[in-house]
């Protein structure tokens, strides 16, 4: 991406992906605007986002979002807003559909107004591997059938399809089909962060056991800053398209647990982990792994392998536990 010549709008800028993306774009000299739906968080600001203009805006409010897009006139829009929790989508399915699905359409419509007025604008939707449901073939590509099995996946699938509609209409509209991606900023409601924290506490003698759900499901685990960089690459591509963002390396939760304990020099981990079937999620795909060949052809590649990723997450939690005294 050429340095310093874009006006960027990122929805969900205070989330994991939005935070890393905003920092990367601001460091490159771009004018960066970001939204969050919680007015108190916008007012409080974020020390890590110096130079980023924060706005209170909600994808549920079509008129307010439309006004913001018209005022900022972004040349690039990244829609990263909304909960990324599959588990939460089961308890709040209508809200998930409204924010993740219809909310994306509200933003697409606002972007279309800029496009229709002759203004250059490129749009990226943060899609998800959950749109593929429990796929029959691996690895998945951009052509894998869309067949979601969760409310989260269904909402993301609708947004994904609407991006294609606006692309066919003539707008530069893209999707980044994101597989699991982690960082020290990931909330502990997600399994990778939960494991990293639990292992750090066990290593420090703070607890004896780590309780998890199904540890035999497999996922393609990546590093969030790499995936933020991938979104930059996608919007800088010569043509709009859909792009799988993945490492191509499928590892089970069991593998993740073992690697996390290795990071604190504990090999005999089985006795320290309990599996609770009450924590199993309904309709959880057994295996998801992506083929990012289309994205790699643009020059992108992940910077970390699986072991290095897990080590970074665990070391961050070891430091956090130590700082708590």
Regions found by a protein language model. Name each.
Residues 59-99:
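NAD(P)H-binding glycine-rich loop region in Rossmannoid oxidoreductase-like domains
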Residues 9-26:
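N-terminal Rossmann NAD(P)H-binding glycine-rich loop of SDR-like oxidoreductase domains
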Residues 21, 27, 35, 64, ...:
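C-terminal substrate-binding subdomain of Rossmann-fold SDR/epimerase-dehydratase oxidoreductases
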Residues 49-61:
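Rossmann-fold cofactor-recognition segment
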Residues 30-41:
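Conserved glycine-rich Rossmann-like NAD(P)H-binding loop of the short-chain dehydrogenase/reductase
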Residues 62, 104-108, 231:
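Conserved internal alpha-helix within the Rossmann fold of NAD(P)-dependent oxidoreductases
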Residues 91-109, 118-125, 130-175, 182-186:
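Catalytic helix-loop patch of NAD(P)-dependent Rossmann-fold dehydrogenases
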Residues 11, 35, 77-81, 123-129, ...:
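SDR active-site strand-loop-helix element
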């Amino acid at each position: 991406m050429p340095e310093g010549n874009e006006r960027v709008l990122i929805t969900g800028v205070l989330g994991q992906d939005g935070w890393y993306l905003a920092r990367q774009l601001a460091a490159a000299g771009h004018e960066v605007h970001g939204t969050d739906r919680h007015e108190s968080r916008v007012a409080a600001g974020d020390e890590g986002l110096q130079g980023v203009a924060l706005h209170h805006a909600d994808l549920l409010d079509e008129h307010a979002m439309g006004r913001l897009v018209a005022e900022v006139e972004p040349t690039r829009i990244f829609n990263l807003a909304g909960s990324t929790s599959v588990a939460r989508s089961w308890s709040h399915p209508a809200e998930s559909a409204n924010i993740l699905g219809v909310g994306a359409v509200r933003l697409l419509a606002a972007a279309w107004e800029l496009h229709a007025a002759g203004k250059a604008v490129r749009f990226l939707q943060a899609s998800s591997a959950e749109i593929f449901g429990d796929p029959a073939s691996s690895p998945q590509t951009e052509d894998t059938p869309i067949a979601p099995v969760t409310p989260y996946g269904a909402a993301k699938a609708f947004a994904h399809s609407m991006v294609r509609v606006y692309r066919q209409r003539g707008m530069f509209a893209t999707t980044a089909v994101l597989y699991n991606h982690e960082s020290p900023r990931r909330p502990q409601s997600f399994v990778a962060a939960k494991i990293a924290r639990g292992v750090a506490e066990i290593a420090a003698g703070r607890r004896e056991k780590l309780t998890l759900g199904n540890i035999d499901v497999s996922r393609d685990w990546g590093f969030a800053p790499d995936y933020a960089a991938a979104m930059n690459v996608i919007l800088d591509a010569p043509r709009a398209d859909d792009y799988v963002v993945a490492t191509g390396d499928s590892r089970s939760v069991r593998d993740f647990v073992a690697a996390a304990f290795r990071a604190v020099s504990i090999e005999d981990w089985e006795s320290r982990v309990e599996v609770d079937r009450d924590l199993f999620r309904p309709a959880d795909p057994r295996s998801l792994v992506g083929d990012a060949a289309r994205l790699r052809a643009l020059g992108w590649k992940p910077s970390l392998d699986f072991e290095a990723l897990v080590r970074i997450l665990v070391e961050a939690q070891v430091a956090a536990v130590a700082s708590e005294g």
